[in-house]
Amino acid sequence: MEIIKEKTVAITGSHTTEILSGRNDTNLLNVLFTETYLLIASLYQQGFKTFLCGMSDGFETIVAEAVLRFQKEKADIELVTVQPNSEIERDEYLLANSSLLICYCDHHDKDAMRIFERAKKGGMPTTNLHTLLTDYFANDSPAKQALQSYNNIDGFSYCKEGILLCYLYGEKPIIAPFENIEQVEQRDDKLYVTLTNELEVDAYILSE
């Protein structure tokens, strides 16, 4: 398969244990998946159609799953798995064959930070989703805390601002911010969220 560098995104990031380390947040992986999916949709609109990604547990797996889900919307988006013999070879391949780097890492993850810093030093545009979640990490609202008990649901998605009610490709996501959530209540096998405008949304609570 021919890789067009100008339309290709490289992916790297932390393992699941590193993502969750030091954070008491059962919805963080859900939020990260949503934000990754929205970013992929945005990049696709900009002409990026190929994503180079390893298959390590954690952010790389999240990206792979998000690309495959988005493939149901746009069949011409491609996921290319990268499995070189060493991390150095992986870094070289990713940087040589892409024009944008997407990652999730902080200063504790030396491996992911290594390629992130190399990309920036080389002038490659980069996006670190860890930085994009700064406000989410700082949010300690009652609504965010109340939703922590429900990390496996079907009906809406968690995002960095609150809950994503609806998203159609090419349109602005419909989001209910945490500050607009008035009540969170479980009734039988469903979760009901009441907003400050008295609108009520619900989701099924799935078994583990």
Across the structure, where does each feature detected by a protein language model lie?
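Beta-strand-connecting loop/turn residues
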Residues: 7, 161-163, 189
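Short hydrophobic/aromatic-rich beta-strand segments that constitute the beta-sheet cores
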Residues: 103, 163-167, 193
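Tryptophan-centered short beta-strand motifs
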Residues: 79, 173-175
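Acidic, Ser/Thr- and proline-rich intrinsically disordered linker/docking segments
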Residues: 145-152, 172-173, 180-208
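Conserved beta-hairpin
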Residues: 147-170
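Acidic/glycine-enriched connector segments
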Residues: 2-143
